[in-house]
Design a protein with these regions (language model features):
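Small-residue-rich anion-binding loops in enzyme active sites
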Residues: 1-4
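FAD-site-proximal beta/loop scaffold in flavoenzymes
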Residues: 8-40, 111-112, 119-121, 125, ...
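General small-molecule cofactor/ligand-binding pocket signal
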Residues: 13, 94-96, 132, 201
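Rossmann-like NAD(P)H-binding beta-loop-alpha module
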Residues: 28-64
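Rossmann-like dinucleotide-binding cores of NAD(P)H-dependent redox enzymes
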Residues: 56-103, 121
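A conserved short coil-to-beta-strand element within the FAD-binding core of flavoproteins
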Residues: 98-110, 122-126, 136
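A conserved FAD-binding loop/helix module that cradles the flavin
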Residues: 206-225
C-alpha cells in the first residue's frame, strides 16, 4: 500500500486484487460490478512495471473512460518489458512521469479545490475523487528532487501496482528454501527451477518478480519439463 493521507477511501485497490477480481468475473464466478470498476470511470494506476501495464490495459477493456499511469521516474526508467509498455500506449493508456503521489482526495476536498457548492452527500468524505501529486525533477547528477509545484488528477479509482513482494508463508514454514534480498525465491539453472532445497522447484512471479501471466505459464512449463 501507499502510506499517504486518504488511504482509507473507497476506490483504492491493489493491482493483484483487481486482476484477480476480473478473472473471477470473466469466469462467471463473480458479478461484474464486484471488480470495483465501472463504465466511464477515470482510473489512475500507480507504478510502471508489467503488472501496472496489465492492470491499466485491463481497466481500458473493462470500460474505463481514461486510464493514466503515474510514475515517479522518467519514461526511460520504467521497469516493464518494452513490449508491455508499447502495447499499453497502443491501447490508449496515458502516462504521467515524474509525479509522486502525496495524498488521496475525497469528493468534498475536490469540490473545495474547484470551488463547487452543492448539497453534501454521505459519500463525500468516504469516496475517492482525486489524487494529489508532487512534481519531480531529475537533476544532471541523476538525483530526483521535488520541485515545480503540485497537481491534482481527478479519478474514481486508483490501482496500486507498487512494492509487491512474494508472500513469505511457504518459505518461512519450509526449511532450506532461500530467497534474495527482495524476497524472491532463488532457483538454479540446472536442474532448471530447483530451489536451494533439493527436489523442490519454483517458478513464476515468486522467482522473477511481477510480470505477465504468459511469462509465468511459460516458466512453469519449462520447470515441469
Amino acid at each position: 500500500t501507499l502510506d499517504i493521507p486518504g488511504k482509507e477511501l473507497s476506490g483504492i485497490l491493489t493491482a493483484t486484487y483487481f486482476l484477480r477480481m476480473v478473472v473471477l468475473s470473466d469466469s462467471g464466478k463473480l458479478d461484474e460490478s464486484e471488480t470495483l470498476l465501472h463504465d466511464g470511470d477515470n482510473v489512475v494506476v500507480i507504478g510502471a512495471g508489467n503488472v501496472a501495464m496489465d492492470a491499466a490495459r485491463t481497466a481500458i477493456r473493462r470500460g474505463a473512460e481514461n486510464v493514466t499511469i503515474v510514475y515517479h521516474k522518467t519514461e526511460a526508467e520504467i521497469s516493464s518489458f518494452p513490449s508491455e509498455y508499447e502495447a499499453a500506449v497502443k491501447e490508449g493508456v496515458q502516462f504521467n512521469f515524474l509525479k509522486q503521489p502525496i495524498a488521496y482526495l475525497n469528493k468534498k476536498q475536490m469540490r473545495a479545490l474547484n470551488n463547487i457548492r452543492r448539497k453534501p452527500a454521505e459519500s463525500d468524505e468516504t469516496d475517492l475523487a482525486g489524487l494529489l501529486v508532487q512534481n519531480i525533477t531529475k537533476t544532471d547528477d541523476g538525483q530526483f528532487v521535488t520541485e515545480g509545484g503540485q497537481e491534482v488528477i481527478p479519478c474514481d479509482c486508483v490501482i496500486l501496482a507498487i512494492g509487491q513482494r512474494p508472500a513469505a508463508r511457504i518459505v518461512s514454514t519450509t526449511k532450506g528454501i532461500q530467497v534474495d534480498d527482495r524476497g524472491f525465491v532463488i532457483t538454479r539453472e540446472r536442474p532448471y527451477g530447483m530451489t536451494t532445497r533439493a527436489g523442490v522447484f519454483s517458478s513464476g512471479d515468486v522467482v522473477h518478480g511481477p510480470a505477465t501471466v504468459v511469462l509465468a505459464m511459460k516458466e512453469s512449463k519449462k520447470v515441469a519439463a
